[in-house]
Amino acid sequence: LKSRLVLAEHYNSITLKDAELKVNNLPFTADGTIRHFPENRHTRIDMDMGLKISDMNDLLKFIPDAYFQNRDKIQAEGSILMEGSIHGFLGDSIVPNANLCCKIENGSYHIKDIKQGIDTLEMDLDIHLNGPFPDSSFVSLEQLTMKGLNTSLDMQAKVTNLFKNPAVRAGMKGKVDFTRLGQEFLNPDTLLVEGVMDADLSTTFTVNDLVESRFGKIHSSGKLNIDKLKAFSQSLGMDIFISDAI
C-alpha cells in the first residue's frame, strides 16, 4: 500500500489520497475516507477505487502463467476500465452500498504471426450491491460481443435477487467454438474446454429452479444447439459435460 495518509479526530478518521494497493496482485488506486464512530461502533466508508491499468496487453501480465499457452506470443489490444465505489455505514446488520463498473472497448486477442484470433471483444458490466436494501442489488451485463476463431457472439443478461434466489434474465445470439478458443489460448492442463454452441435464445429462470431441475419453471424462447460441451479444471473445481442439447 502506497498512499498519502491523513489521520484526524483522535485517529478515528483515516483519509487515503492517491493510494496504490494490490488486490490479487492487480494494482488499484483508492481515494476516500474511513471514519469510525465509537459511540455506536459504526464505521462510515466513502471510498472510490479504480484499476490502475488501462491497456488490455498490460492486464495479461497479471494473469497466472498456468492459464495460458504461448503466453509470450499473445498480443492483446484495447482499453479496459474498472471503477468502483463504497459509500455508507458498516456495523451490526449494516452494510454500505458498493458499485463496480467494468468495460472493455476495441479489444482484440491474437497470437503473434498468426492472423486469426479474437478480432472483436467488447464488454460492459455493472454491479450494484445495495447495503440498506439488498433486494435491490443486481448484476447487469449490458453487452458482451466477441468475434473471431469461428465464434460470433452477442449477449446481454441481468441478475437480480442476488442474496436469496438469484433470478436471471438473459439473451444470446451467435456461435461459440469452445474447442477452437481453447486450443489457441488456454493451457489444457489448467482449463480444458471443448464443444460448439449455437444460440438465438432468450431465457428467464431462478438459480433454485435450475439446481432443483424444475425445468417447467425455466422459460426460454428461440434455439439452443450444443454439440458436446466439456469444461474441466481440477484447480477451479469445474467438471461440466453436456451432450447433444437441442
PLM features: residue spans?
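Conserved N-terminal beta-sheet scaffold of ABC transporter nucleotide-binding domains
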Residues: 18
